[in-house]
Amino acid sequence: MKLSWLEAAALTAASVVSADELAFSPPFYPSPWANGQGEWAEAYQRAVAIVSQMTLDEKVNLTTGTGWELEKCVGQTGGVPRLNIGGMCLQDSPLGIRDSDYNSAFPAGVNVAATWDKNLAYLRGQAMGQEFSDKGIDVQLGPAAGPLGRSPDGGRNWEGFSPDPALTGVLFAETIKGIQDAGVVATAKHYILNEQEHFRQVAEAAGYGFNISDTISSNVDDKTIHEMYLWPFADAVRAGVGAIMCSYNQINNSYGCQNSYTLNKLLKAELGFQGFVMSDWGAHHSGVGSALAGLDMSMPGDITFDSATSFWGTNLTIAVLNGTVPQWRVDDMAVRIMAAYYKVGRDRLYQPPNFSSWTRDEYGFKYFYPQEGPYEKVNHFVNVQRNHSEVIRKLGADSTVLLKNNNALPLTGKERKVAILGEDAGSNSYGANGCSDRGCDNGTLAMAWGSGTAEFPYLVTPEQAIQAEVLKHKGSVYAITDNWALSQVETLAKQASVSLVFVNSDAGEGYISVDGNEGDRNNLTLWKNGDNLIKAAANNCNNTIVVIHSVGPVLVDEWYDHPNVTAILWAGLPGQESGNSLADVLYGRVNPGAKSPFTWGKTREAYGDYLVRELNNGNGAPQDDFSEGVFIDYRGFDKRNETPIYEFGHGLSYTTFNYSGLHIQVLNASSNAQVATETGAAPTFGQVGNASDYVYPEGLTRISKFIYPWLNSTDLKASSGDPYYGVDTAEHVPEGATDGSPQPVLPAGGGSGGNPRLYDELIRVSVTVKNTGRVAGDAVPQLYVSLGGPNEPKVVLRKFDRLTLKPSEETVWTTTLTRRDLSNWDVAAQDWVITSYPKKVHVGSSSRQLPLHAALPKVQ
């Protein structure tokens, strides 16, 4: 027997849900239309005013990419020249501009998470936004909160932040604010449950020898999707994000870019998202179906790259003309796109792209792939870096986690002989950008691989920075960057005052395989003989310091407690200032204050939550059952009584801190926001007209492979090229999908990020934090809540901050808990509720160092 979504979800309170019980994604129609609520009001009105002047083909032009490698950006829509609206330029990545030049390479999202610093997250976002804007880019394809990081070996975890939804949500939102305050539309991606690279695309899987009919399905219950994977996207919507990218995977066997439950219900009806949903590149699988399910923009426009075919473009024009897609739906798409454009002030900053993603040549054809159009200047070589190296260097240092320190750090600079050991300390012999999309692990790891990358303007290696430091102090420094030269390593380590050993572990996007790792990591071990390299040094030098550059946790059990391993640092993926950032920490110019954004287990088995690496459904879509529910990372370790080597939130400092004086105060806060019980009717703007209004303009020189909105003739069937044109829509259009009448507002909806009551501040918590050491440093107070239910995690992170304190200085850190912070998702009520179970608050320096705790008073 297959259960309904709600029945299956309800079972998770007491049991594990089977694959069959999660095999269905319930329909939700019609697609909610934007209404300009909250901070969107002005942008919405401007969007309505301009869209009201557009013809149908002009609206369609905004919704459909012009094709892969046709124009300068990785994605570009058509424009509306008649109204002085250029095509939108969309460009990767979450850590800087991909396929460009004279831009910065920022630290990855996982490093931002390690800072636990809201202000730094904002400043990084703002700096990236400035660079994108200066290059003529309208939409940055980032940041990412999907993957969240369900499995530690997931290939693209590093593009996001942390497997904790609260930590991710806060830093996700701050990044978005920074990008959009710089005048660029941010894209929250990949929505949703995009937690592994294996089987994410049919053609990609075929390249690795797997014959599947459809992409992997992430099968999840209603409670888990709300409390874990949707949580950071709610923060993004509340922050005003302009765009959301839907993902390649299926959710409960319905594709992410045509899943009416996740797009229409969760995103637009519950969270009140007012911006536009774009497809990931190649994630668009239908025309009418995706339009009615809530997709607003097709990227890059063609069905497969350079196929000259599109589910939208001409076919979307036809679908509106023949009534299959109602006018209000395409109007809503256009309004959402233009509202996002106006909200960030892009109209004031707009300029055409001044670079080409496809060539570094100064001159070339305007339309790259077909080599057609005017021959013109395509690269203007605009330097957009400003002074961003400063925030990059600071973020790199402030994200370096001191995992272990037996009084070995900081270095004094007086060390007579310094050994630098490991390939990860040095340069890529091919050059910093020598591997396309960073698809190799040569030299120091400062950025992982895939589309989520940027070109380095330069890369300061650890070897370069440390050598400069040692020579400044008249010492001696030697480097061995061959991880297999163990005999030479042993000899040098015996002579050294300190041995700095550099190791790494890489991962990335599934279209690139590095050393047999097809995007996802094959394991959590160090790459390139790293464990043996460390042991060779530690067995011969009593002051061995290990530096790890990695995309996530690695297994350190073989050597972390070696008596000669005196310190361990995790530096993540620190970007272009890698060596300088590290030297700042090693030599004490920066006191490390970072905290691990994930758990370091003793074994891979300790994490559970294995990736699906082999077919498990014949040649059908592989099935990935999220049967662990909300118990990932530290939540799972706590549930299974697994003792980690380093817990979530752990990180040492060159000073010490004390936490005391926990105080709790109930607040009489209540939202004054009036939430309507029903929406208005779906608005329409302008007239549709007739087929004769939308045939190709006379005299137009068509560009090969370019995706246009026009018709070849007034014969809609002939223009569509669809052999199934004319089938009975009653059999294929879901019930209610075209209904533009007023709709009920969901109990969990009614505002940006959900019902405004969720954000009522119910309890104030204050704690005294004191620097008890002899140097200034950063404390990161962490507040966790026990929600009390018998099947809830032991604790869940809810609040945090990063505080700089001088020696002996103390401060009172105050934060508030909202209704959302204290609630669980009720699958029967389809709403957030504060349960009657007793709740506690815990405060300390990590998920397992929580000296302060108290019962919370009951609130509603």
Curated annotation (Swiss-Prot):
What does the record give under GO molecular function? beta-glucosidase activity
Signal peptide start-end:
1-19
Glycosylated at which positions? 61, 211, 252, 315, 322, 354, 387, 442, 523, 542, 564, 658, 668, 690, 712
Q: Which cysteines are joined by disulfide bonds?
A: none
Q: Give the active-site positions.
A: D280
Please name the GO terms of the biological process aspect recorded for this protein, alphabetically: cellulose catabolic process
Sorted alphabetically, the keyword list is: Carbohydrate metabolism, Cellulose degradation, Glycoprotein, Glycosidase, Hydrolase, Polysaccharide degradation, Signal
Catalytic activity line of the entry:
Hydrolysis of terminal, non-reducing beta-D-glucosyl residues with release of beta-D-glucose
Entry EC no(s): 3.2.1.21
Its annotated pathway reads: Glycan metabolism; cellulose degradation
Look up keyword Calcium and say if it applies: no
Regarding protein family, the annotation reads:
Belongs to the glycosyl hydrolase 3 family.
The name under which this protein is listed is: Beta-glucosidase 1
Q: What is the lineage of its organism?
A: Eukaryota, Fungi, Dikarya, Ascomycota, Pezizomycotina
